[in-house]
Amino acid sequence: MSSESSKKRKPKVIRSDGAPAEGKRNRSDTEQEGKYYSEEAEVDLRDPGRDYELYKYTCQELQRLMAEIQDLKSRGGKDVAIEIEERRIQSCVHFMTLKKLNRLAHIRLKKGRDQTHEAKQKVDAYHLQLQNLLYEVMHLQKEITKCLEFKSKHEEIDLVSLEEFYKEAPPDISKAEVTMGDPHQQTLARLDWELEQRKRLAEKYRECLSNKEKILKEIEVKKEYLSSLQPRLNSIMQASLPVQEYLFMPFDQAHKQYETARHLPPPLYVLFVQATAYGQACDKTLSVAIEGSVDEAKALFKPPEDSQDDESDSDAEEEQTTKRRRPTLGVQLDDKRKEMLKRHPLSVMLDLKCKDDSVLHLTFYYLMNLNIMTVKAKVTTAMELITPISAGDLLSPDSVLSCLYPGDHGKKTPNPANQYQFDKVGILTLSDYVLELGHPYLWVQKLGGLHFPKEQPQQTVIADHSLSASHMETTMKLLKTRVQSRLALHKQFASLEHGIVPVTSDCQYLFPAKVVSRLVKWVTVAHEDYMELHFTKDIVDAGLAGDTNLYYMALIERGTAKLQAAVVLNPGYSSIPPVFQLCLNWKGEKTNSNDDNIRAMEGEVNVCYKELCGPWPSHQLLTNQLQRLCVLLDVYLETESHDDSVEGPKEFPQEKMCLRLFRGPSRMKPFKYNHPQGFFSHR
């Protein structure tokens, strides 16, 4: 490469007028080529620094000569041409020097590139050798790791300890004088002893198998004998069915129930056993039954069968699944929610009969993954009831059992561990699913023997029979009381919507014979509307207006006076009395905030409610309170002082007998009715 490039770079000769041209023309080409090639050798001998100084000196001389030529040309004269020619010759010599320096610089550049290329090739060769060596090192390290990780099969055998080996092994195997000092021989001896022991155990195993076969044959013979007895026993049971029905002793049906109960989950099983025992011992009207698919319940406890066909076809199934579209995240969450909220196939039904032939149907479910129980309720009556508009929520499955115990509204899960499970599948609260799954009341968990301590949450809760038995009787009585109370309210609301306040004969003595004020309106009120009423602020601030309560509005009129009564009916009625808030529209608007007598009227029905309870179980409390409000409105209007400036008779003449019309600076009216005297007095 260097020779070819040097041939192309032939130096050009600049001729001057003063130099002899003929001599230069006669030089041979070989001499010129020799001079050209000598420059490559000259590069190694010359100092680049000195060439650089020569280059600067030559450039300065050229500048000087050019300046002198310019100066001579500007002056003019006869001798100027000769001087200019001399300087021109000197300039040509300097140009030749510059061209030579330029050629030397190019030759140095080429040599530098060639040296760099050779050094780069050496570096690449060394780098390749390094990569090969690193690969060899990595390969050797892998082989070393495999050697270190190698485990012999005898290492997986659990050999007896050394003490036991030397104690039990015979001398011809243990060879203590040889094996004590040689670990290798010691291991071989222990393996020989292990082999000897396994041979003995294998012989013993064969003997046991032969004994097992003999016992199995005996069992088969006995099974054949017992199976021959089964048809006879069935015929005897069928023949005894009429006797069982006649004596009201359904042993066959009970036996089937007990067989089905074996497949119940522990909480439902505890409920079934305790409810059946309570019904037999204390309440004959309680009937217990099991519903659902027994086959599905059996399938839950059946272990999965391992088949070789499934393993052989796994590759084909995997290939098919890869071609299917992967379900979206929303579909996966829905499937996880359904799996988490899955109920057990079997459920327990309790039918609780009341005095008026009404029946409370309770269906108990068990949520397997959440480990809680739920219940759905339904009330049926002997005669079809005409449901008033205001009684729509009294017997609804969503509210009929609400707050059977104080604060137990059944909208939250009683198991603290469920909240962590809900977070994984995106469930905010269980209240969104209670209509489908049922309500997880606390008393339902206790009937199933489940108790979830909040202070120290337990990972697994076991059903406890004693817990269920301790709450069974109290809960059944509360359920009966709740149904009877709701049915009584149902009948009363039918009369109230027609403007009739039903007062039983047992409670007539609580009121005067003549009551002029009358009920004209009885409607249900939404919880939000009740919260917005201006005269119910005290109840709302006191925290008595919960969303589990029922709200109603009563309107009582007499003449131009209209009394509004906002009623809060607790689910625990009648053990918890209703709360009334009053607003009288007559000569302005009067509430407990601006009229002490209105506050006193509220106290008569809210505080002194025990006087109005009537005979147990106090189902007439609400109607007696409404009737008392009518009487109180009569007293309020009749005892109001007459304005002398208004002509004509008094709008509400006094018909009630009062010992004293007013008392104290607040002019309180006599609202207490005294029986049997029939007059009103102050408290």
Swiss-Prot record:
The modification N-acetylserine is found at S2. It holds the Pfam family FmiP_Thoc5. Residues 2-144 are annotated as: Interaction with CSF1R. One of its GO terms (molecular function) is mRNA binding. Residues 2-199 are annotated as: Interaction with THOC7. Changing T380K: In a breast cancer sample; somatic mutation. Changing G499S: In a breast cancer sample; somatic mutation. It is found in: Nucleus; Cytoplasm. It comes from the Eukaryota. Component of the THO subcomplex, which is composed of THOC1, THOC2, THOC3, THOC5, THOC6 and THOC7. The THO subcomplex interacts with DDX39B to form the THO-DDX39B complex which multimerizes into a 28-subunit tetrameric assembly. Component of the transcription/export (TREX) complex at least composed of ALYREF/THOC4, DDX39B, SARNP/CIP29, CHTOP and the THO subcomplex; in the complex interacts with THOC1, THOC2, THOC5, THOC6 and THOC7; forms a coiled-coil dimer with THOC7; together with THOC6 and THOC7, plays a key structural role in oligomerization of the THO-DDX39B complex. This is THO complex subunit 5. The gene is THOC5.
